[in-house]
């Protein structure tokens, strides 16, 4: 199934749930989050390689991402249509729920040599914002480490080719990276599969 068709059958139902809840009272974050499980997995733990895990995400990052989808400010194949059916209050309820869930890195194969190169690239160019090797979801940046390789490839393509919103410094860095640099970073993030690495003291 392609990215364009992935989850398309869920869109009508998801929009109905969001709009119906908003018309009365805000449903619990857990109930709203349940509607995301078809693509993002139970409690935000993705089992589909084209879809990111969203458990443990920063609340502010989650809300802003959903607003960007809803307002057409972020490239999407499906999420813009899904986000349209929810209010900001519902985004905030979902964000609180997902932020409280433990992050489980994807178990997958990776190229160890590329991962070693990627670790050096990350430390030099990406670590100031994506701290702790990309395992730390605070500071309102995305969780990179432990995501599926196909999802990371799509995400980098969105940033580089489709103008996905990003900090100016990140935009400059990505413009300088070769395809090999990007692949090295992706395999570095994919290599981090120890769940203990994602537990950080606040």
PLM regions: where:
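Bacterial N-terminal signal peptides
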Residues: 8-17
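Bacterial N-terminal signal peptides that target proteins for export
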Residues: 1-9
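C-type cytochrome heme c attachment motif
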Residues: 31-42, 64-67, 92-96, 120-132, ...
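Sec/Tat signal peptide C-region and signal peptidase I cleavage site
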Residues: 19-23
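Inter-heme linker and motif-flanking segments adjacent to c-type heme-binding CXXCH motifs
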Residues: 45-46, 75, 100-113, 127-128, ...
